[in-house]
Amino acid sequence: MTLDRDAASHVAEVLSEALPYIRRFVGKTLVIKYGGNAMESEELKTGFARDIVLMKAVGINPVVVHGGGPQIGDLLKRLSIESHFIDGMRVTDSATMDVVEMVLGGQVNKDIVNLINRHGGSAIGLTGKDAELIRARKLTVSRQTPEMTTPEIIDIGHVGEVVSVNTDLLNMLVKGDFIPVIAPIGVGANGESYNINADLVAGKVAEALKAEKLMLLTNIAGLMDKQGQVLTGLTTEQVNELIADGTIYGGMLPKIKCALDAVQGGVNSSHIIDGRVPNAVLLEIFTDSGVGTLITNRKPR
């Protein structure tokens, strides 16, 4: 076999650049929220699984939290169950909650676990109900217009927020060289199920584990300024300024708030990364430039 010197040189250069990052993150926990386009393309799905296995192989401890909104929507449509959204949250009645559990805890979770294991990992699938991994309570949503004297309380059904995370379970799995893959379903005080935003679950898991990084895969290149340029490194103070001046708005606000809360809760850095880019997770961790936006309390890159 003829050696392609240019290709070999490129591989050596990549490995050389990655080495200091590998040393820095050995033994550290990284929480990755997996969703969006990265879950829909077969090539990107395979690349994500290989990235997770490689991270574990070099001594990093990945914990995966996944979404599944499009898959839930598809099954609801086939079952002729209409979907309604309030402030970006799916109104989840009992019938919808059954579908959410079926899709997230069954189909999506097991597909991810199987893919990671096929590429040499030891993934184990969980929902927040397993060993009360994610204790939750009903999320209260209110709305007030100038004409109202008091806020209107809106019932959005079985939509929840995280109360606590069973870190003993996750630490046991990580120490046993397993890769936890978590479906964002919480359990209430009376055993009831709650549908929770996957970004929020990932953020709270990262906080509870005091993770090195929280990584949120998205369908955009990262946070952008008003000229459309990606902001590669920001402090929490700078992010708050961008929210105040309207640079960050709309659908990105909940994701950014999750990233901010994680950093303020003890996570070293949060990352908004482009899940459409092959090997996005590895590129963000192991290269100088990364492929998204890093948010930290330290001096940004």
Swiss-Prot record:
It is found in: Cytoplasm. SUPFAM superfamilies: Carbamate kinase-like. It comes from the Bacteria. GO terms for molecular function: acetylglutamate kinase activity; ATP binding. It holds the Pfam family AA_kinase. It catalyses: N-acetyl-L-glutamate + ATP = N-acetyl-L-glutamyl 5-phosphate + ADP. Pathway: Amino-acid biosynthesis; L-arginine biosynthesis; N(2)-acetyl-L-ornithine from L-glutamate: step 2/4. Its EC number is 2.7.2.8. Keywords: Amino-acid biosynthesis, Arginine biosynthesis, ATP-binding, Cytoplasm, Kinase, Nucleotide-binding, Transferase. GO terms for biological process: arginine biosynthetic process via ornithine; L-arginine biosynthetic process. It is an enzyme of class 2 (transferase). Substrate binds at residues 68-69, 90, 195. GO terms for cellular component: cytoplasm. The record marks 33, 255 as: Transition state stabilizer. InterPro entries: AceGlu_kinase-like_sf, AcgluKinase_fam, ArgB, Asp/Glu/Uridylate_kinase, Glu/AcGlu_kinase, NAGK-C. Catalyzes the ATP-dependent phosphorylation of N-acetyl-L-glutamate. Belongs to the acetylglutamate kinase family. ArgB subfamily. This is Acetylglutamate kinase. It comes from Pseudomonas putida (strain ATCC 47054 / DSM 6125 / CFBP 8728 / NCIMB 11950 / KT2440).
